[in-house]
Curated annotation (Swiss-Prot):
GO cellular component annotations of the record: nucleus
GO MF assignments: DNA binding; zinc ion binding
Organism: Arabidopsis thaliana
Sequence segments annotated as region (Disordered): 87-139
PANTHER family to which the protein is assigned, alphabetical: PTHR44489, ZINC FINGER CCCH DOMAIN-CONTAINING PROTEIN 59-RELATED (PTHR44489:SF14)
Keyword list, A-Z: DNA-binding, Metal-binding, Repeat, WD repeat, Zinc, Zinc-finger
UniProt gene name: ZFWD3
Protein name, entry field: Zinc finger CCCH domain-containing protein 59
Amino acid sequence: MGHQSSWMKQTVIDSVVQSSKVGVFSMFSMDYKAPRKYSHGRNFGVARQQDFAADIVTRRPYAPYDNGMKKGPNKLSRNLVWTSKEYKSPEGNRPRQNAANGSAKPQVIGTGHRVSNQPRKNAVYGPRSSSLSDTRGCGPRLNGSPKKSVCNFWKDGNCKKGEKCQFLHSWSCFPGLAMVAALEGHKNDIKGIALPQGSDKLFSVSGDGTLLIWDCNSGQCVRSINLQAEAGSLISEGPWVFLGLPNAVKAFNVQNSKDVHLEGVVGQVHAMTAANGMLFAGTSSGSILVWKATDSESDPFKYLTSLEGHHSGEVTCFVVGGEVLYSGSVDKTIKVWDLNTLQCRMTLKQHIGTVTSLLCWDKCLISSSLDGTIKLWACSENESLKVVQTRKQELSVHTLCGMHDAEAKPIMFCSYQNGAVGIFDLPSFEERGKMFSTQTICTLTIGPGGLLFSGDKSGNLRVWSLASGTKV
């Protein structure tokens, strides 16, 4: 694939252990039937290396970013939770070459197709000799006001105004951030993206009922699996990949090809996370189901309980900070759970719309909602959480994630309804730039080596690179 697929080789393969050559996801050629329609949901997690499910039992839970450390998260925890088989052939959608104005279309990596490695001179990639931080076309307008939207003519590769255009000629407007690949195959909103440890495969699942497995060496889709049901969520934890389905959670180990059906699920699973040796799954009914990892190879996950005092509506998101699990819901509340006792400590009720995403940073909780607000919560003297800052957006907010920039400063990505993603400094909430998509981005996942994966409601899966970026 030439230099266009180098993101796979240079960053992922350097950071992810090569897997043994095992069969991939045999579990999903399953005799599984489910109701056709369920409402959408989303969430994702990030993996840590483990040999067996029993290893999850002994590891420490996620923890928020600690300002007392030099760079990055608590090294003893895995604080990375910031918190149809018809495919379009790229042969008929090849990017136009326009040296003056650039092309909006990045390399399209499809299922079983290869795209010729043509010279690129555009605002997405820049010339061959340029770095991935090219943001040409992101400068100010002639009157000094910033450009706030992408040029529709540039998207089609035929804007004649060049640098004088009042609209952006780039998919991103942030120093060092560039889109490096577009993976094509999904036809509906992407519910989860996972890059499990011990594997050289990227997993993505969509509301179109397909699970796609991508090879990190070539960037090609190596397998498409018809789930025969609408998926609700996808996460990875260690070598395990977990898939939330109607009335089911499926688990697959990429190291030994073991697949497991987790019992006890009633309703569509919209959100999952793992911490303290346990897997948590939030359903459409508002219940939160818990499985405990065991040292049994035949039964690696044992159903433990359903958390009492659960939400009155669909659980949409999770995040873990220290010894606490936070859950958000369409009932507009955030519940705070003790990971040791599995009891609800408190319920937060400041949002007036669905809580869409949760993020732990420093000793604070950050939440977003369809009400268009981002709230920063901090502990008060009586150990309750109170809102200390609210940022009001013009549009509904759909997902949050965080990482460090090239200067090791924490930044937050915030997805809006119009397809834009705001990039903010923490803790000031000052907006530093944006990245863009054609539809609302509903999934953001941080990868190794400064990679960021985004999935939108039209099925576009894009790979971004932030120069010298690290996970928060």
